[in-house]
């Protein structure tokens, strides 16, 4: 009986001491970048770390759209973020872009075709600088994304977080400063170049 108690105590202490998976930061598997222009003037670079172990399909979509390696999409436009605009910027909320087909938030497409399903919602919108998929409801992911500028926990379970800003949060803040409550930016902000590091 003593042996069982000792073994049980050791197991419980070991389990208690093990780090929790939920408390860990997601593993960054890829790094990509956006070079930003505001009113045709270089503003700087944002570098993102992508969580490819947690949401591999979503990460592969974004990574490939950063490089443009997939060529033309079903829309006849390049599957590439280069030269696309940030069409919606709301201070104290987020910066949205990725509509390279229409430029106004009504378009975009994924490397898998028009839309793809939500992969999972394991990562929460728990801090500024997170990269998440913009969508029009469940399972409608394309190419549009947003970068949080505050905690946005009300989006948990509705939008897939797949990366974070690892360099250039000052550029994110600069973009945020040209936003409005309606979401219409006061200046033209675009991705002049994008790729993988």
UniProtKB/Swiss-Prot annotation:
Regulation of protein activity: Binds cyclosporin A (CsA). CsA mediates some of its effects via an inhibitory action on PPIase.
Catalyzed reaction equations: [protein]-peptidylproline (omega=180) = [protein]-peptidylproline (omega=0)
EC number(s) per entry: 5.2.1.8
Signal peptide (residue range): 1-22
A single GO molecular function term of this UniProt record: peptidyl-prolyl cis-trans isomerase activity
InterPro entries: Cyclophilin-like_dom_sf, Cyclophilin-type_PPIase, Cyclophilin-type_PPIase_CS, Cyclophilin-type_PPIase_dom
Subcellular compartments: Microsome
One Pfam family, short name: Pro_isomerase
Principal location: other
Alphabetical UniProt keywords: Endoplasmic reticulum, Isomerase, Microsome, Rotamase, Signal
UniProt GO BP: protein folding
GO cellular component: cytoplasm; endoplasmic reticulum; intracellular membrane-bounded organelle
Family as reported in the entry's similarity comment: Belongs to the cyclophilin-type PPIase family.
Function: PPIases accelerate the folding of proteins. It catalyzes the cis-trans isomerization of proline imidic peptide bonds in oligopeptides.
Protein name according to UniProt: Peptidyl-prolyl cis-trans isomerase B
Native species: Dictyostelium discoideum
């Amino acid at each position: 009986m003593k042996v069982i108690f000792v073994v049980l105590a050791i197991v419980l202490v070991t389990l208690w001491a093990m780090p929790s998976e939920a408390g860990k930061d997601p593993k960054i598997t890829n790094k990509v970048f956006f070079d930003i222009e505001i009113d045709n003037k270089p503003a700087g670079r944002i570098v993102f770390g992508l969580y490819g172990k947690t949401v591999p399909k979503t990460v592969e979509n974004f990574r490939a759209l950063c490089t443009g390696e997939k060529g033309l999409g079903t829309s006849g436009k390049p599957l590439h973020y280069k030269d696309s605009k940030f069409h919606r910027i709301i201070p104290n909320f987020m910066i949205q872009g990725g509509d390279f087909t229409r430029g106004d938030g009504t378009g975009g497409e994924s490397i898998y075709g028009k839309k793809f399903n939500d992969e999972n919602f394991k990562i929460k919108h728990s801090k500024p600088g997170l990269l998440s998929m913009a969508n029009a409801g469940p399972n409608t992911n394309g190419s549009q994304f947003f970068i949080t500028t505050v905690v946005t926990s009300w989006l948990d379970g509705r939008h897939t977080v797949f990366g974070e800003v690892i360099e250039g949060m000052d550029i994110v803040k600069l973009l945020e400063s040209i936003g409005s409550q309606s979401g219409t930016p006061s200046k033209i902000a675009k991705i002049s170049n994008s790729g993988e590091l």
